[in-house]
Amino acid sequence: MNSAEKLRLLRQRMQEQGMDAYVVVTDDFHGSEYVGDYFKAREYLSGFTGSAGTLVVLPDSAALWTDGRYFLQAADQLAGSTIDLMRAGQPGVPTIGAFLAQRVPQGGTVGFDGRTVSSLFARTMAAALEGKNVRFAYEQDLAGAVWPDRPALSAQPVWELPAECAGLTREEKLRLLREKMRETGAEVLVLTALDEVAWTLNLRGDDVRCTPVFLSFLLLRQEEATLCVQEQILSGELKEKLVACGVALAPYESIYDRLRAIPAGTAVQTDSATANYCVLQSLSGAKVLDRPSPVQLMKAMKTPAEQENFRAAHIKDGVAVCRFICWLQSHVGKEPITECSAAAKLESFRAQQPDYLGPSFDSIMAFGPHGAIVHYEPTAETDVPLEPRSFCLADTGGHYLQGTTDITRTIPLGPLTEEERRAYTVVLKGHLRLGAARFPEGLCGQNLDILARLPLWEQGMDYNHGTGHGVGYVLGVHEGPQRLHWRLPENQKVTALAEGMVVSNEPGYYAAGQFGIRHENLELVQRDGENEYGRFLHFEPLTMVPFDRTALELSLLSEEELALLRSLRPGLVQLEIGVQSTNQDTLKEIRRVA
């Protein structure tokens, strides 16, 4: 059944329910960046497989919004469909709210599954529709009604993260959160984001691909806590441990009844940016304190134990990636290698490292023109052979018990054109300048983003994605609230970079139809002294994989930039020390790449 037939069935349901529009987002019940298969209704209906996008279906047309990362991919996957591509943020492209205001009649009805739509997005739509007396029908999962073979809701076993890995016990975290609640006057704290629940309880799961979280909600009061979860995913031992520290268990789907049962006027803190619309509607009688969860900043600022573990994880990851680069450059052109088989080979190298848990996201292994598609993921349909020329852009990562990694290396596979060498070098200039930044405490990513982009801007080049994102500790590979981007997303507050945060440093350049360049390291924000101007911070590089000097146009690098490139060498020495006593062959592979 193609997308046109699926939309026809959906429109039949819309007509039966008296709906003038139906909105399908790319979210689960928790506002997660990546979602389990059960929640991929937008993908099922449209055929667009990117991780970000919103589908709006009208009685006689349909449109899909996505961001700059996916413009090329969406154009390709929607070609020949009846769905119009809306390139969000581009000139002349209306917002979803403005589009609905133009198309939905006075007194009309807009439908959506309120469990998957964030309260913030619903408010944005309502503001755009103000004055039209439009009704929201938010209790109808029409997409599910026309999806006969929908996957079941995930219910994978939960496991416990050792306290020595986290640096704080769950009891200590609950105590700290209750202190924050007293400061804000919250009587109840509702945690709806999966990574926040997992972080608070030092638990991990496998309900979302590549993200070690489990489907759950957590209600926290001063004297008690309730975890709404599918109880079959908890072992008897874990249940006993949770109860022992004051955490009661309740069915996952009971969250809305429990919220409605909170006495009127009770001060309840939740975050409309992540809490779904049904959560907020269930709190209609409470005094809602709408603000970011205190967990967000607490988990972003890694404990000393987490910081030390992150370093250990990157040594392991560095060994695996160096071995992969050595293998790839030695074998390309001599044996059949495709994007998919290369990604599998890198995964096999990571799997040989102790305490490896799995990939932190689906690998981007992109040869030649595919590298220009920012978030390209090879599939059986798109897979191509690697040839001894141009670049292979490898954006990959892994979860280890000691931490999460995210690295991009643009690997030369053979002779390069002058344009490829120039682009590789200019992007590296931006990466080095940002990584070397020393800056006052209190600055945010917006202030620093220009350091990475300026070398490209000077050449009339740019990239249509953020420069950096936070990284969780055996959680989401993308986490906030910190980010590096000159453009602030709508309704998002600025968060200053702080000691202990982990951020990516990943400028890029993409020549459509030709090649893509991205250089990505993870950086740990560290204190850099204090003087009469206040405290200063700097970045400590965590990633320990060298950049390929054979791809550089050295004449474009200043002496300072060459020195910065050489300054990364001590990290490679740590890789060598980590393996020289156990595996001489691996040591040779690392030295060859370095």
Residue ranges and their predicted role:
Residues 557-594:
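Conserved non-cysteine loop/helix-boundary elements of the Radical SAM core domain that shape
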Residues 1-558, 563-567:
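Active-site neighborhoods and metal-handling regions in enzymes and metal-associated proteins
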